[in-house]
A protein has these predicted regions:
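Mature, function-bearing regions of proteins
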Residues: 1, 75, 80, 84, ...
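Secondary-structure capping and boundary motifs in well-ordered enzyme cores
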Residues: 10, 46-51, 143-150
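Aromatic-rich, lipid-facing transmembrane alpha helices and their immediate juxtamembrane interface loops
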Residues: 24, 35-39, 90-97
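C-terminal or internal capping secondary-structure element at the end of a domain, subdomain, or sheet
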Residues: 140-188
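Structural signal for well-ordered, non-membrane alpha-helices
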Residues: 15, 19-26, 63-66, 103-110, ...
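Acidic interhelical loop/turn segments
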Residues: 29-41, 110-143, 175
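A conserved active-site cap/scaffold subdomain adjacent to cofactor or substrate pockets
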Residues: 3, 7-15
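Conserved alpha-helical segments that form or flank metal/cofactor-binding pockets of metalloenzymes
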Residues: 48-82
Length: 190
């Protein structure tokens, strides 16, 4: 499987799901007369980033590999998105802001050619973390061992935050794209 075939559909499916999770988080708050923006400050633990950051990081992690696997520097707008994730406590934004970030990321991914990232499989990738830790790997290793796990970490954190705070989410909300593969007549009734 090529890097493009692996990453782009995965990111697209999960970001669409994440958008639906946000919708499910907002509706009951609005119905109860609560401020929906407060949902963006929810978190699992005091030392974890809030929901706003998890959404921003999910989108950052979906776009970062596109640039790295094409040998391009990360654009200023993408670095600003990561910075906004780091600063989400001070500026959590609103669910509408989060939806706009997701929509922009989906549009960006949707514009990619079917083989846009394939030339990067053997490309040497150097990744430096803010704490100074550095990794050297191939594009294939980067896609498999960093890009996908990092994306899923933040997507799952967003899901877990919402679930932990009472949003009615289940497995079908997490992997709605799997419904396309259901064998007819096999979904239990009731």
């Amino acid at each position: 499987m090529s890097p493009t075939q692996l990453l782009v559909p995965t990111y697209t499916q999960m970001l669409r799901a994440q958008s639906a999770w946000l919708d499910k988080a907002v509706a009951p708050r609005q119905a109860a007369g609560e401020e929906p923006d407060a949902a963006m400050t929810l978190r699992l633990a005091p030392d974890m980033y809030p929901l706003a950051a998890q959404v921003r990081f999910s989108c950052f992690q979906a776009m970062e590999p596109v640039h790295r696997l094409r040998g391009e520097p990360l654009p200023a707008a993408l670095l600003a998105l990561r910075e906004a994730g780091w600063n989400a406590d001070a500026q959590p934004g609103s669910p509408a802001d989060a939806q706009a970030i997701i929509a922009g990321t989906l549009a960006f991914l949707g514009e990619l050619a079917p083989d846009a990232l394939d030339g990067g499989a053997a490309l040497p990738i150097s990744l430096e973390l803010p704490n100074g830790t550095a990794f050297d790997m191939t594009g294939e290793q980067y896609a498999r061992d960093w890009a996908l796990p990092q994306f899923y970490f933040h997507a799952i954190a967003a899901y877990a935050i919402l679930r932990h705070h009472g949003v009615e989410l289940g497995k079908a909300d997490y992997v709605p794209h799997m419904l396309a593969y259901v064998r007819p007549g096999t979904i239990p009734q009731g």
